[in-house]
Amino acid sequence: MTEFIFLDLDDTILDFHRAERIALAKALREFGVEPTDSVLSRYHVINQQHWQRLERGELTRDQVQEGRFRVLFAELGKDTNAAAVTRCYERNLGIGHYFLPGARETVERLSGHYRLFLASNGTASVQHSRLTSAGLYPYFEKVFISEEIGFNKPSREFFDACFARIPGFEREKAIMVGDSLTSDILGGIRSGLRTCWLNPNHLPVRPEITPDFVIESLPQLEGLL
């Protein structure tokens, strides 16, 4: 029996890639860089590398947020204030929210039958802004953001801190749902939760990180609970 559902936000409920693309293009142009396909592609590689290092505990959040732009602009041979670029990017990202197909309706239906909790590794100010503009707060009992918790997914410390804040929490009645194997699914497994991987692109499952369920879109979750 499922009672507690932990949901990731980016690319689980909201289309982060679309919001990111728009915010990134605006920030780059403001600081003199044309957001060509090659520039955007290189940014995504650098960004992914930085977030993976955060998950492994090798970088702090500030080092990720500014470091990705510092590396990108250095590769482009341009001097810039990485902190200023970061502020511009996050300001634009915070006002962008685009729901994935069926996600809003699914969250609304689930909230009537289960206790929903948001579990995000995103930047607190950005995520709170997006949650507000998307009108998602009423559906969640609590919102857990790593920057405020003090630990990042997939660490057990992140999930343990979440569990401690939930009255009457029962681990065996909980499930973690998200699009990231290395963050959402690995974190859920480490913390003794059932896990559901949102995998719209049909990526291969890694043998060392095996979710209990795999779905292509969030509405499919309802049939598994």
Predicted regions and their residues:
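Asp-based, Mg2+/Mn2+-dependent phosphohydrolase catalytic module
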Residues: 1-5, 17-18, 80, 108, ...
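N-terminal helical cap/lid subdomain that shapes the substrate entry/recognition surface
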Residues: 2-101
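Structured helix-beta-strand junction loops
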Residues: 46, 112-113, 139
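Catalytic-core regions built around general acid/base machinery
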Residues: 102-113
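Glycine-centered short loops/turns at secondary-structure junctions
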Residues: 113-114, 192
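Conserved serine/cysteine hydrolase catalytic core
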Residues: 117
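Conserved phosphate-coupling serine/threonine residues in phosphotransfer and NTP-handling enzymes
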Residues: 120
